[in-house]
């Protein structure tokens, strides 16, 4: 009986190691394909990736003479009510810039061209 239990435990352990190796190899395959970016923009933004690219370009243009090669935006720091976004240049320099006038800022077709009609956080969205 002890021999059967020991063989069973080795079988379970071998299966777990095999499953772990398979999971690790699929993870590595995903990493080589590139990381999937998840943008958390409101639903009234029709193409989040396009907007993020445009904002990153604005951010880079603003600091084109900077020696730092690090430029980033953060979708959590977009203020659709005031039509601004946070641009990060390196670990210690942040700048608030204006969103382009054509940027949607509300669910009813509002744009940053008329900031008085823009809405902030929409409850339930």
From Swiss-Prot:
Q: In which tissues is it expressed?
A: Expressed in salivary glands.
Q: Quote the cellular component terms of the Gene Ontology held in the record.
A: extracellular region
Alphabetized UniProt keyword annotations:
Glycoprotein, Secreted, Signal
So which residues have sugars stuck on them?
82, 94
Secreted is among the record's keywords: yes
Q: Residue span of the signal peptide, if any?
A: 1-15
Q: Coiled-coil intervals in this record?
A: none
Q: Where is this region: CD4-binding?
A: 106-125
Cellular location of this protein?
A: Secreted
What upregulates it? By feeding. By the presence of Borrelia burgdorferi.
State whether it acts alone or in a complex, and with which partners, per the record: Interacts with host CD4. Interacts with host DC-SIGN (CD209). Interacts with Borrelia outer surface protein C (OspC).
Q: Which family does it belong to?
A: Belongs to the salp15 family.
What the protein does comes down to: Salivary tick protein that downregulates host immune system by binding to both dendritic cells, and CD4(+) T cells. Specifically binds to the CD4 coreceptor on T cells. This interaction prevents the activation of the Src kinase, Lck, and its downstream substrate Zap-70, and results in deficient activation of PLCgamma1, the repression of calcium fluxes triggered by T-cell antigen receptor (TCR) ligation, and a subsequent reduction in interleukin-2 production.
Name the record gives this protein: Salivary protein 15 Ipac-1
Q: State the organism of origin.
A: Ixodes pacificus (Western black-legged tick)
């Amino acid at each position: 009986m002890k021999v059967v239990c020991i063989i069973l435990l080795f079988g379970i352990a071998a299966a777990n190691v095999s499953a772990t190796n398979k999971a690790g190899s699929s993870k590595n395959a995903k990493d080589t394909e590139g990381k999937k970016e998840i943008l958390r923009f409101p639903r009234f933004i029709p193409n989040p990736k396009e907007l993020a690219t445009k904002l990153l370009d604005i951010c880079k243009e603003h600091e084109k003479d900077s020696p730092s090669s690090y430029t980033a935006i953060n979708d959590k720091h977009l203020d659709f009510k005031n039509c601004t976004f946070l641009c990060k240049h390196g670990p210690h320099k942040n700048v608030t810039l204006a969103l382009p006038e054509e940027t949607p800022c509300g669910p009813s077709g509002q744009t940053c061209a008329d900031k008085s009609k823009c809405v902030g956080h929409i409850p339930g969205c």
